[in-house]
């Protein structure tokens, strides 16, 4: 099985989901196209890692883990984790910042800020929902099942904050270094 297979199994370990829901949850930390997700789900269903029930009202398939799927996740989490892959087009552009016009630099940083402000705005209601769940003593089991998701959303929110602060710092440094030239 490939890494995407294990990621999907991890998502299903939390709760049964449709393929669309899996895509939404995965976007917190993994990118995959719907076609990839459904291809992998079909293969894992054939191999016995997941099964699905068709919702008669919507004709959507709701996927769940089988015992074989639970065992696969349990074994996979013990394996060494691969180094994260980092590809950031913005950073490639920043690498040649000294060659850019000042207006281009300003636009580049403004675009980056806009992107991370948008992501922070998406994270905020998710974070608030999970923090409400955390503080509700009547929903302890639901909090337990959502704890990993909370850690990921919180990390993503913190990274947005850090990225925005870095943009301010880097642009200030650029101006203090290049405005005099």
Spans of model-derived segments:
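Noncatalytic linker/hinge segments flanking ATPase motor cores
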Residues: 7, 51-53, 93, 103-109, ...
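Mid-protein regulatory/catalytic core that forms ligand/cofactor-binding pockets
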Residues: 110-181
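Histidine kinase transmitter module recognition
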Residues: 11-14, 29, 53, 97, ...
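Amphipathic, non-membrane alpha-helical segments in soluble helical-bundle scaffolds
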Residues: 34, 59, 84, 106-109, ...
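Basic helix-turn-helix/winged-helix DNA-binding cores
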Residues: 1-90
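Amphipathic alpha-helical dimerization/coiled-coil segments
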Residues: 75-125
